[in-house]
């Protein structure tokens, strides 16, 4: 009876698998064609940085598998990347039809799926340097799983490689998302043993690089979420000896929807965790770039128009690719031309900086309110509504930092302290002499308040001309 039941289950599974496999196999080619059409339609709208066309060839649909090649052609090349017109990036794609792809079953995953796929980069004229760097192994291999509900998961295996002065060990990244629009995307990954050779005698190493990101699109147009990228256990090495160590260098990004508005707030933060030089812990630091009330539609339009204009410039003047100065000038001119698109939402830009050690914290903050030139009534500055700049330097914290630096250079404790006292005293005297700082409660401060036509510097009100004159005397 048990054997008969088991046989019945196996037969039933075979029927379901066979029928389902035939059905899901018929969905592969239309899905590929739709993806290609969407990609190429986006190109026509100017949404790509380069003029690229996606296509497929050699589609071979079997009962259990479908195989084809996906190729991305740089129609006009990419001069700044040394890519010639017509060069291609090609992928071999091997799709196992659902509802029970064999690869998933081999990994113990019995949840029905639309398909599973293996994707490999093809070694050709354009990608050959990647294979050479990976010692003739495939530099990346991807395994994808597509669920019936539209969700997907991807595992990307990265081979150890050496690209000139930059090398790394094995790595793996996973991507999980909902729907082909990537409306919800979760990314995790890790790469081991990173080395950047600055010169024959100097290099920077990191034990690992990790990334953890969760993002989504609200109403299909407002990107929100957060991500964290981290280099762990960094060493700066000179002539074989450790010069400095950093426990971690972290980059964090956060995007939030502005309540009741079609804008987003963006927060980009860099953290330096526990900097050590010699045997001295110098402290930890943080720098942020915060942009509030950003219009994502305007950003999208800015990128599209900028990309179209840059493609035209590179097509008309191919020599720009080999002239860094000229290319920067073109970049600056295009940025200035399309900047008003970003100014329409009148965003606020903030840049707080802080450094802390055992005795306290040094901090500074720049706060700029951007104006829409079309709405501004100012006769002197139509780009800025206001600018605030504040610096606070507790003298004991500054002195401690100077002392630690002196100790890291090999000074004894008494000499390091005396030298630090002398250094900071001289700096404070100079700052007061030029009226750059005020000192109160053992804290040196600088404060600047600007609105078009008026400046308040360390409590003294003056015109823009007076302030620029004073700043000019200091610079010269």
From Swiss-Prot:
Keywords: Signal. Residues 1-24 form the signal peptide. InterPro entries: DUF945. Pfam families: DUF945. To E.coli YdgA and H.influenzae HI_1236. This is Uncharacterized protein YihF. It comes from Escherichia coli (strain K12). The gene is yihF.
């Amino acid at each position: 009876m048990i054997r008969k039941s088991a046989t019945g289950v196996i037969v039933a599974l075979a029927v379901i698998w066979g029928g389902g496999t035939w059905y899901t196999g018929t969905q592969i080619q239309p899905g590929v064609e739709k993806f290609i059409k969407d990609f190429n339609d986006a190109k026509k709208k100017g949404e790509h940085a380069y003029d690229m066309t996606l296509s497929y060839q050699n589609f071979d649909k079997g009962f259990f598998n479908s195989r084809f090649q996906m190729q991305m052609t740089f129609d006009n090349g990419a001069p700044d990347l040394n890519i010639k017109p017509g060069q291609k990036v090609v992928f071999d794609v091997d799709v196992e039809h659902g509802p029970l792809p064999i690869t998933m079953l081999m990994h113990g995953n019995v949840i029905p799926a639309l398909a599973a796929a293996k994707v490999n980069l093809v070694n050709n004229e354009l990608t050959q340097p990647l294979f050479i760097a990976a010692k003739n192994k495939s530099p990346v291999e991807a395994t994808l799983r597509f669920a019936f509900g539209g969700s997907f998961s991807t595992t990307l295996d990265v081979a150890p490689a050496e690209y000139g002065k930059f090398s790394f060990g094995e790595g793996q990244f996973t991507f999980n998302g909902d729907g082909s629009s990537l409306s919800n995307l979760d990314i995790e990954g890790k790469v081991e043993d990173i080395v950047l050779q600055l010169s024959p005698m100097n290099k920077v190493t990191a034990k690992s690089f990790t990334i953890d990101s969760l993002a989504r699109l609200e109403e299909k147009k407002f990107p929100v979420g957060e991500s964290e990228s981290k280099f762990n256990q960094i060493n700066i090495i000179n002539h074989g000896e450790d010069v400095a160590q950093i426990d971690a260098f972290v980059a964090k990004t956060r995007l939030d929807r502005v309540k009741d508005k079609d804008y987003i707030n963006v927060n980009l933060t860099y953290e330096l965790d526990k900097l050590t030089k010699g045997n001295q812990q110098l402290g930890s630091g943080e720098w942020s770039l915060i942009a509030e009330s950003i219009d994502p539609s305007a950003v999208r339009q800015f990128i599209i128009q900028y990309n179209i204009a840059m493609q035209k410039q590179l097509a008309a003047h191919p020599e720009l690719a080999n002239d860094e100065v000229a290319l920067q000038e073109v970049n600056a001119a295009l940025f200035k031309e399309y900047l008003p698109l970003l100014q329409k939402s009148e965003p606020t830009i903030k840049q707080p900086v802080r450094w802390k050690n055992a005795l306290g914290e040094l901090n500074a903050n720049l706060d700029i309110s951007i104006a829409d030139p079309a709405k501004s009534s100012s006769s002197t500055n139509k780009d800025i509504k206001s600018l605030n700049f504040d610096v606070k330097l507790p003298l004991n914290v500054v002195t401690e930092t100077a002392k630690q630096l002196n100790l890291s250079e090999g000074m004894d404790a008494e000499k390091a302290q005396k030298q630090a006292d002398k250094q900071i005293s001289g700096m404070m005297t100079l700052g007061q002499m030029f009226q750059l700082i005020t000192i109160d409660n053992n804290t040196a401060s600088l404060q600047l308040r600007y609105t078009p036509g008026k400046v308040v510097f360390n409590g003294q009100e003056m015109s823009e001309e007076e302030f620029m004159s004073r700043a000019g005397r200091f610079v010269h």
